[in-house]
């Protein structure tokens, strides 16, 4: 058993008291990102090791694995704690997103270790979508690289406001203050172009040696700031969704018998209480909340992030994909939107293509009307292109098959975040963040020949069950 964990349980007065104490700790979700070989997995391993979160059998196994797969000579290869895939261990890299949990006396943490290689950028975006803070690793020998810029931009695009720039491998540059200062100024010059009001902090450290990770470094007396762990324990996280209006996407209509009809889902933002007047969209029908049902019994109110089932006083037509919100709020359904896209497929995203999209519990189709611009990661400039390639990031105009109720992603990630699904393979090919809902549908481009338009009209007339879209943009 983990001796540190056993000591904590003893101090709390038993397992039950310890578990209650854990429930009342705040939770911080963060990810490590940066270029390949910057030491992301090693840093997480060091955090787990120095906070004594490794079980004795894991430590013994780590000693054996370090001899077989390690890249640190006679030292423990802490990266092996999170690099679990055989291909990762053989190549000494991270491919998949690895999640780890640990806690200290002050806070609980969920870590997402994301890959640094450019071809795995889509994995990094997936890991960042649920996080509140990003640790950006920079190799002190190499400075700010393209992947550092790419991951910084994706993190801010996904709504992360807290960035900790961890300048790693300081032991390989003789713990030079000049090197740290130069990289800090270089990154701040780049960060001035990033969107949003960001909280950026810098920590010089050595994940391999443990300098400034969980304890102060004796080799960097010139640095008087907090350690990385102190930053993680004290950073103030304010969830945007808590202050936003109520949004409840219906995931499932629960009808176990004739006497019960509830609408199950996770409250995306705001709060809801018994007796509150709510409105179902897109129908616009109103009712009152009669009960809030949870696994632990009925509640009088619920808050953002909680999984609940709402029972209404009236029997109204609500199905999966509908949205419940406060009755006095106006949120019109829109036929189109401009969307920030991270493209994840080998086949480029091009104007005129149609995809299934899923947003909250709603699934429909969307047509790509145009690509306004992709973003050049090196300098965050915009340029004109014909398509968006694999790992490309850009602003895209979409028109939906049916009007959708949307929020801007920065206001509500649940009702403003969507995924693109290939209609043939059913594979997720892209992630989208609503930049701006639009009340007017874009006019489809006239790039189709007369034969294609006639064939399209013929198919829609005689085979309506195929669901073919009108190439001219009409339904």
Swiss-Prot record:
It is an enzyme of class 2 (transferase). One of its GO terms (biological process) is hydrogen sulfide biosynthetic process. PROSITE patterns: G_TR_1 (PS00301), G_TR_2 (PS51722). Residues 34-41 are annotated as: G1. Residues 25-239 form the tr-type G domain. Residues 168-171 are annotated as: G4. GTP binds at residues 34-41, 113-117, 168-171. Pathway: Sulfur metabolism; hydrogen sulfide biosynthesis; sulfite from sulfate: step 1/3. One of its GO terms (molecular function) is sulfate adenylyltransferase (ATP) activity. Keywords: ATP-binding, GTP-binding, Nucleotide-binding, Nucleotidyltransferase, Transferase. Residues 92-96 are annotated as: G2. Pfam families: GTP-eEF1A_C, GTP_EFTU. The keyword GTP-binding applies. Residues 113-116 are annotated as: G3. Its EC number is 2.7.7.4. Residues 206-208 are annotated as: G5. It catalyses: sulfate + ATP + H(+) = adenosine 5'-phosphosulfate + diphosphate. Belongs to the TRAFAC class translation factor GTPase superfamily. Classic translation factor GTPase family. CysN/NodQ subfamily. Heterodimer composed of CysD, the smaller subunit, and CysN. With CysD forms the ATP sulfurylase (ATPS) that catalyzes the adenylation of sulfate producing adenosine 5'-phosphosulfate (APS) and diphosphate, the first enzymatic step in sulfur assimilation pathway. APS synthesis involves the formation of a high-energy phosphoric-sulfuric acid anhydride bond driven by GTP hydrolysis by CysN coupled to ATP hydrolysis by CysD. HAMAP family: Sulf_adenylyltr_sub1. This is Sulfate adenylyltransferase subunit 1. It comes from Shigella boydii serotype 4 (strain Sb227). The lineage of its organism: Bacteria, Pseudomonadati, Pseudomonadota, Gammaproteobacteria, Enterobacterales. The gene is cysN.
């Amino acid at each position: 058993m983990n001796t540190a964990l056993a000591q904590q349980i003893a101090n709390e007065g038993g397992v039950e008291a310890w578990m209650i104490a854990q429930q009342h700790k705040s939770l911080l979700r963060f990810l490590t990102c940066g270029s390949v070989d910057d030491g992301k997995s090693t840093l997480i391993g060091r955090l787990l090791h120095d906070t004594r979160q490794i079980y004795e059998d894991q430590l013994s196994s780590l000693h054996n694995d370090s001899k077989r797969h390690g890249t640190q000579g006679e030292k423990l290869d802490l990266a092996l704690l999170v690099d679990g895939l055989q291909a990762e261990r053989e190549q000494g890299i991270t491919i998949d997103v690895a999640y780890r949990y640990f806690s200290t006396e002050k806070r609980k943490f969920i870590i997402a270790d994301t890959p640094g290689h450019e071809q795995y950028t889509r994995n990094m975006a997936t890991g960042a979508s649920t996080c509140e803070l990003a640790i950006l690793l920079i190799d002190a020998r190499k400075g700010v690289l393209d992947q550092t810029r790419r991951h910084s931009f994706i993190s801010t695009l996904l709504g992360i406001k807290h960035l900790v720039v961890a300048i790693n491998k300081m032991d390989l540059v003789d713990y030079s203050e000049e090197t740290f200062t130069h990289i800090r100024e270089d990154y701040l010059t780049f960060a001035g172009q990033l969107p949003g009001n960001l909280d950026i902090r810098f920590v010089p450290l050595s994940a391999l040696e443990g300098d400034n990770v969980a304890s102060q470094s004796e080799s960097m007396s010139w640095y008087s700031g907090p350690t990385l762990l102190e930053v993680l324990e004290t950073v103030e996280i304010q969830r945007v969704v808590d202050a936003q209006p109520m949004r409840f996407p219906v995931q499932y209509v629960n009808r176990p018998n004739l006497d019960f009809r509830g609408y199950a889902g996770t409250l995306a933002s705001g709060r809801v209480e018994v007796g509150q007047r709510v409105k179902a969209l897109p129908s616009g029908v109103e009712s009152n909340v009669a009960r809030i049902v949870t696994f632990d019994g009925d509640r009088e109110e619920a808050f953002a992030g909680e999984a609940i089932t709402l029972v209404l006083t009236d029997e109204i037509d609500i199905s999966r994909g509908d949205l419940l919100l406060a009755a006095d709020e106006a949120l019109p359904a829109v036929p189109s939107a401009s969307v920030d896209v991270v493209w994840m497929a080998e086949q480029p995203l091009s104007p005129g293509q149609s995809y299934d999209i899923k947003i909250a519990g709603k699934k429909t189709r969307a047509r790509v009307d145009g690509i306004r611009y992709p973003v050049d990661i090196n300098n965050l400039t915009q340029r004109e292109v014909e398509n968006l390639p694999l790992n490309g990031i850009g602003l895209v105009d979409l028109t939906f098959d049916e009007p959708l109720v949307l929020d801007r992603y920065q206001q509500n990630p649940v009702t403003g975040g969507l995924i693109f699904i290939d209609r043939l393979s059913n594979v997720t090919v892209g992630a989208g963040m609503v930049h701006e809902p639009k009340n007017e549908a874009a006019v489809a481009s006239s790039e189709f020949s007369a034969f294609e338009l006639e064939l399209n009209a013929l198919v829609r007339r005689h085979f309506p069950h195929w669901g073919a879209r009108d190439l001219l943009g009409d339904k």
